[in-house]
UniProtKB/Swiss-Prot annotation:
Region forming the signal peptide: 1-22
Claim: Transmembrane helix is one of the keywords in the record: no
Pfam families with a match to the protein in the record: SBP_bac_5
Phylogenetic placement of the source organism: Bacteria, Bacillati, Bacillota, Bacilli, Lactobacillales
Keyword tags: Cell membrane, Lipoprotein, Membrane, Palmitate, Peptide transport, Protein transport, Signal, Transport
Quaternary structure and partners: The complex is composed of two ATP-binding proteins (OppD and OppF), two transmembrane proteins (OppB and OppC) and a solute-binding protein (OppA).
Recorded superkingdom: Bacteria
One GO cellular component term noted in the UniProt record for this chain: ATP-binding cassette (ABC) transporter complex
Principal place of residence: membrane
Name the record gives this protein: Oligopeptide-binding protein OppA
Lipidation residue positions, type S-diacylglycerol cysteine: 23
Residues with a covalently attached lipid (N-palmitoyl cysteine): 23
Gene that encodes the chain: oppA
């Protein structure tokens, strides 16, 4: 199942599969039949019945925010739509991967890496077409770079990693009209692309590495749309071209997508006649499942697990999540002209002791125990445990509450407790911070207020942004619109990660997703070390990952919160369902064994 590099998620307690929607992406191969387990969950559902011909699969994505339809990957950062777009191609991903997230051949395109030449060659399938029957070309692959690197399109996916492509930084800065490092051996209308790098990195053979793009965009279809209008154009929102086994027949803004088979799909023809994919609110999802309205619902919350685990007619599947939730501190702004974070904000949070104290004051373990139903665990570092070769329990984070240590850190930093107010002061100023907490599920308000009370115990006054939780889409706009806002101090984030654990795209000085805009030479060195040629040695790379996590915990620019197991209740009429990371299948092979939902 394919993933984009990083994708924002709505809930910070525990998330379902995000882009790892229960049926993977458009790249389809045979279904895995291995009896895989994640914790106590089966990863796949082995339906004893065969699929009927045709049928309609009914899927929902649980969200309290509207669907933001954007069919161009460089212009989208929303996990909800990333999942909902997957029957049509998951915003048109290109490569197959195995269960270790390494590239394999056989998908819409193959990639070959040449270490000595410092190049990648991407070869598109000869029969790869858009859903209008037009050829997918080399120019369509380059166009994804145009969308990402040309500021006129408004993408927030430009990173230091992409700057490793020869000529792409000059193009991004407006110093060049073309990208010198991307060439077409067979011409723009051919099927071969060569990408020239400045340096090769050890993670380049992993999906989501961030050093080259994994998607295409239909250049001929979109070339006449003005860059400033493209993100909102019907051609990218409601009437797109796609490459997957299904194509959108109808897109209802904010609500739903109806898919029908794509007659120009290169692979196995779908078994289903149609797929409907809808938004369902957290308030209605459990009732909808109990009424057998959907075959499955993506992004069920951990807090709902007890309500859905025994609903008749469903099998609950699970998978270790490529997921990390964390707390951010607002430390600076993003310099758009220079594409770099500047850590210049005047705030008590510039003091490391204050950041650490806020981290140690949180009772994350108690929150997870109360609300996650065993589906989330406190995080000791920024790398999820599914990447067991790159993390270690020896990394010490903020998973255990330590109010004594938090108080000591603030005492050492000169923050004195005013006994009449109960809050700390320094140089005549109260330690008062704004918490931009956001809506995730029914427990979001309770969890936010809980953390505010924990911070009060150490004398830190924290109030919600404008006195309430932020709606998720508003929060995303607030955090991702450069140069950033000065009206918040603390926020939470949750990320659906890629198969390459390097976090250049999250925390490098150039990463727009570095919401707090910290810029630290030591962290930059750590990130670069992870991707250096020395890190081609797996032992060296693991040590580099551990050092990076230890340094991030020490400096506390962000504070890890939780890891998660995703679960998905699947109706027992569904055939060919798996959450296996190595399964590139299912949108063609998934089917139903009956026209009616199973109820027993």
């Amino acid at each position: 199942m394919k993933k984009l590099k990083v994708t924002l998620l709505a809930s910070s307690v525990v998330l379902a599969a995000a882009l790892l929607s229960a049926c993977g992406s458009n790249q389809n191969s045979s279904t895995s039949t291995k009896k895989l387990k994640a914790g106590n969950f089966d990863v796949a559902y082995q339906n004893p019945d065969k699929a009927i011909k045709g049928g309609n699969l009914k899927i929902a994505y649980q969200s309290d925010s509207p669907m933001k339809a954007e069919w161009l990957a460089p212009l989208s950062d929303d996990a909800t739509f990333g999942s909902m777009s997957s029957p049509g191609g998951g915003q048109d991903g290109l490569f197959f991967t195995n269960s270790s997230f390494k590239y394999i051949n056989g998908g819409p395109a193959n990639v070959s890496l040449y270490k000595d030449a410092k190049t990648a060659t991407i070869t598109l399938r000869k029969d790869l077409k858009w859903s209008d029957g037009s050829e997918v070309t080399a120019k369509d692959y380059e166009f994804s770079y145009d969308l990402t690197a040309n500021p006129a399109y408004g993408s927030d996916r430009w990173t230091d990693s992409l700057a490793n492509i020869v000529g792409l930084s000059d193009y991004h800065a407006g110093k060049a009209k073309t990208i010198s490092g991307i060439t077409f051996p067979d011409g723009e209308n051919g099927k071969v692309i060569k990408v020239q790098f400045k340096e090769m990195t050890p993670g380049m053979n992993q999906t989501g590495n961030g050093y080259f793009l994994e998607t295409v965009a239909p250049y001929q279809y979109l070339k006449d749309v003005a860059p400033k209008d493209l993100a909102s154009s019907p051609k990218s929102t409601t009437k797109p071209l796609v490459t997957g086994p299904f194509k959108p027949e109808n897109v209802v803004a904010g609500e739903s997508i109806k898919y029908v088979p794509n007659p120009y799909y290169w692979g196995e023809k779908p078994k289903l006649n149609s797929i409907t994919y809808e938004i369902v609110s957290t308030a209605k999802s459990v009732a909808a499942l109990s009424a057998h309205k959907y075959d499955y619902i993506n992004d069920m919350r951990a807090s709902q697990y007890k309500q859905v685990k025994d609903v008749k007619g469903y099998k609950v599947l699970g998978q270790q999540e490529l997921y990390i939730s964390l707390m951010y501190y607002n430390l600076g702004h993003y310099d758009v002209k220079k594409s770099i974070s500047v850590q210049d904000r005047k705030t008590p949070l510039q003091d490391q002791n204050v950041r650490e104290a806020l981290g140690y004051a949180r009772n994350v373990a108690a929150v997870q125990a109360k609300f996650s139903n065993g589906l989330a665990t406190p995080a000791n570092g920024l790398i999820p445990p599914i990447f067991k070769e790159f993390t270690s329990p020896s990394v010490k984070g903020y998973e255990k509450q330590d109010l004594d240590k938090a108080n000591k850190l603030l005492d050492e930093d000169g923050w004195k407790l005013n006994k009449s107010t109960g809050y700390r002061e320094k140089d005549g100023k109260e330690l008062s911070l704004v918490y931009a907490a956001r809506v995730g599920d029914a427990n979001s308000e309770t969890i936010a207020q809980n953390y505010i009370q924990q911070w009060k115990k150490i004398g830190v006054k924290v109030s919600l942004y404008h006195g309430k939780l932020m709606e998720f889409n508003s929060w995303v706009d607030h955090m991702t619109t450069p140069p950033g806002s000065d009206d918040w101090d603390i926020t939470d984030g949750a990320w659906s990660l890629s198969g390459e654990p390097s976090q250049q795209d999250l925390f490098s000085a150039a990463a727009p997703y570095n919401f707090g805009h910290f810029n630290d030479p030591e962290i930059t060195k750590d990130l670069n070390d992870i991707d250096s040629t020395k890190a081609e040695d797996s032992t060296y790379r693991k040590a580099a990952f551990i050092k990076y996590q230890e340094d991030m915990n020490k400096k506390a620019y962000v504070v890890p919160t939780a890891y998660a197991i995703n679960y998905t209740p699947v109706n027992k009429r569904v055939v060919g369902m798996t959450l296996d990371y190595g399964a590139m299948n299912t949108w063609s092979e998934i089917g139903v064994s009956s026209d009616k939902m199973a109820t027993k």
